[in-house]
Amino acid sequence: MSTVQDYPSRLSRPESRKMGTFSYLPPMGEAEIRRQVEWIVKNGWNPGIEHTEPDFAAQIYWYMWKLPMFGETDVDAILAELKACHEANPGHHVRLIGYDNFTQSQGANMIVYRGTAV
């Protein structure tokens, strides 16, 4: 019989909170982030960027960074916007979203930069 591994994520400890599937993995490097952006573009999804303070990351609403990048296929432009959002909001979580036009939903959603917990 297998056992379920416990992840020590507690509301009382903001630094332990997990935000989505990728948050249980080690932080992504630039090459991994690039591959995720390429995958979003390859699927024809529209990238969007959002950010929020770590204390409010569990809430539904995050701040939108500009408008979603409808039809953007330049991976470097998307990465530049992610970096610009992070530099403008250094203490915030920054996430990348891939909007799927066909299903009218989010096809991808991942935190690219983790802010510092207070």
From Swiss-Prot:
Q: Which InterPro entries match?
A: RuBisCO_ssu, RuBisCO_ssu_dom, RuBisCO_ssu_sf
Q: Which SUPFAM superfamilies match?
A: RuBisCO, small subunit
Instruction: Give the Gene Ontology MF terms in alphabetical order.
Output: ribulose-bisphosphate carboxylase activity
GO process terms (BP): reductive pentose-phosphate cycle
| SMART domains per record | RuBisCO_small
List UniProt keywords, sorted A-Z: Calvin cycle, Carbon dioxide fixation, Photosynthesis
**Superkingdom of the source species:** Bacteria
Query: In the UniProt record, does the keyword Translocase occur?
Result: no
Listed Gene3D superfamilies:
Ribulose bisphosphate carboxylase, small subunit
Miscellaneous comment in the UniProt entry for this protein: The basic functional RuBisCO is composed of a large chain homodimer in a 'head-to-tail' conformation. In form I RuBisCO this homodimer is arranged in a barrel-like tetramer with the small subunits forming a tetrameric 'cap' on each end of the 'barrel'.
Q: Could you tell me which PANTHER family the record lists for this protein?
A: RIBULOSE BISPHOSPHATE CARBOXYLASE SMALL CHAIN 1, CHLOROPLASTIC
Query: Could you tell me which HAMAP family the record lists for this protein?
Result: RuBisCO_S_bact (MF_00859)
Q: Which family does it belong to?
A: Belongs to the RuBisCO small chain family.
Q: How does it assemble?
A: Heterohexadecamer of 8 large and 8 small subunits.
Summarizing the function annotation, the protein's role is: RuBisCO catalyzes two reactions: the carboxylation of D-ribulose 1,5-bisphosphate, the primary event in carbon dioxide fixation, as well as the oxidative fragmentation of the pentose substrate. Both reactions occur simultaneously and in competition at the same active site. Although the small subunit is not catalytic it is essential for maximal activity.
Q: What is this protein called?
A: Ribulose bisphosphate carboxylase small subunit
